[in-house]
């Protein structure tokens, strides 16, 4: 039997999966997130987390690193060649062997596209858009936060939600039902100082995640109710998402019809975002005159690692 390991390293968690040569997932473990951009120790700290997970998976299955034919790591935050190279240096120091490192955005294509060709658009903790074209060329768009104009991820939505409420309460600019939803869900009054108290929650590690999640939840509740300010944000998200997707069509070779687009990340797969996703598809096709097949990833992204390794005969 041949063994392979797939690593899906995200901002909040990292999954390590052991596969055989028939694509069967034999076992899996999880650790904390391994995105170096979120860690005080940067890439060395991320390498420590990754190796701890790999070693835990090996130990659990009575295997050694030399028993593994190949390991494919798909890691959030690996956006530049220099980051890739530094990560490899750190992993080599820690005894890693026979492995490849890519940005995590690429494995969703290998996991969700029936032929391994397509565009993957991820909106989760962050945003990135990756593709593998008909020639096997790989391209990444976005992933650099405000520098690249990323929209649609959880932190961005939470920020936009707070801003709309701020505009209503503090600027008296536009009424939004988000204000009433915030009053209800956070137990605050629709007053300036009460709203600003949420900033302390966003800066508190113990409360930050739940506060962001609540802001996201009330945002989609307002969208479902047709709240005009919230719908304005949805239109921004869809327009920017369409621009990201079409950047791949313009810069790569997709001489197929329709073009596969795999949507991944919690905003696309775990939240009631149908209104947004429908508008995203509509704008993508309207701006390009092309047909696209949009699918939401319904399997663990880490399965894209084994598909990729066997497709490319890594370790063969």
What do the predicted segments below correspond to?
Residues 1-67, 90, 112-117, 163-316:
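ATP-binding/phosphotransfer module of carbohydrate and carboxylate kinases, centering on a glycine-rich
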Residues 78-175:
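Phosphate-binding/catalytic loop of phosphoryl-transfer enzymes
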Residues 76, 145-146, 197, 265:
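Flexible, active-site-adjacent loop/turn segments at secondary-structure boundaries
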Residues 72-78, 123-126, 259-270:
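Glycine-rich beta-strand-to-loop/alpha-helix junction loops that act as flexible
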Residues 74, 102, 295-297:
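Structural motif
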